[in-house]
Amino acid sequence: MALILASSSKIRSALLTAAGVTFAIQTAEVDETAIKEKWQAEKRDNSQLALTLAEAKAQAVADHYPDDLVLGCDSTVMTEEGALLSKPVSRQDAADHLRLLAGKSHILTSAVAIIEKGKTVFRHHDSATLTMRDFSDSFLSHYLDQEWPEIGYCVGGYRLEGLGIQLFEAIQGDHFTIMGLPLLPLLAYLRKASIVEA
């Protein structure tokens, strides 16, 4: 039985590789916008959305790999006002997201779900609170010059493993959760499932 990562995220792949996990990659084709719109129309708890998206991604790939473990992942960013942000689609969109978050705290939730033989056998989510500083327009322009288009793949428009760390004045939460993968609970499950050595 193989482990398949249903994500094209470079950072998630790098985190798993660094932890010694062997896996294949198969990108999930999921209409995230439709799921988010339905979620908001039903006024469901935004803190659970990342878990729903992670399961949807895992299921989309598991349909094609019924004999393997499929790992789906997702992260969401929710503003203090309860608005959900999506991945920025343009440099201007990224600038707008970052200006919206500047000087405030937001909640980043990362989730994982594993599907085996059509059933969810593991699911976990964790949240972190990140507080952005008030930054200047010149810093924002410099940041976008350095980080766009790579941050277009990041729901908050930032990557803490690079220049994005300078956007923040405070961070509360697990490092791996902030990177997009609640790694320690995931590794505990993978050991239990004999995917990695115990």
UniProtKB/Swiss-Prot annotation:
EC assignment: 3.6.1.9
Catalytic residue positions: D74 (proton acceptor)
GO BP annotations, alphabetical order: nucleotide metabolic process
Entry keyword set: Cytoplasm, Hydrolase, Nucleotide metabolism
Substrates-to-products reaction catalysed: a ribonucleoside 5'-triphosphate + H2O = a ribonucleoside 5'-phosphate + diphosphate + H(+); a 2'-deoxyribonucleoside 5'-triphosphate + H2O = a 2'-deoxyribonucleoside 5'-phosphate + diphosphate + H(+)
GO molecular function terms listed in the Swiss-Prot or TrEMBL record: nucleoside triphosphate diphosphatase activity
Localisation: Cytoplasm
Pfam families noted in UniProt: Maf
InterPro entries cross-referenced by the UniProt entry: ITPase-like_fam, Maf-like
HAMAP family given in the database record: Maf
Family per record: Belongs to the Maf family.
UniProt-recorded name of the protein: Nucleoside triphosphate pyrophosphatase
Organism: Zymomonas mobilis subsp. mobilis (strain ATCC 31821 / ZM4 / CP4)
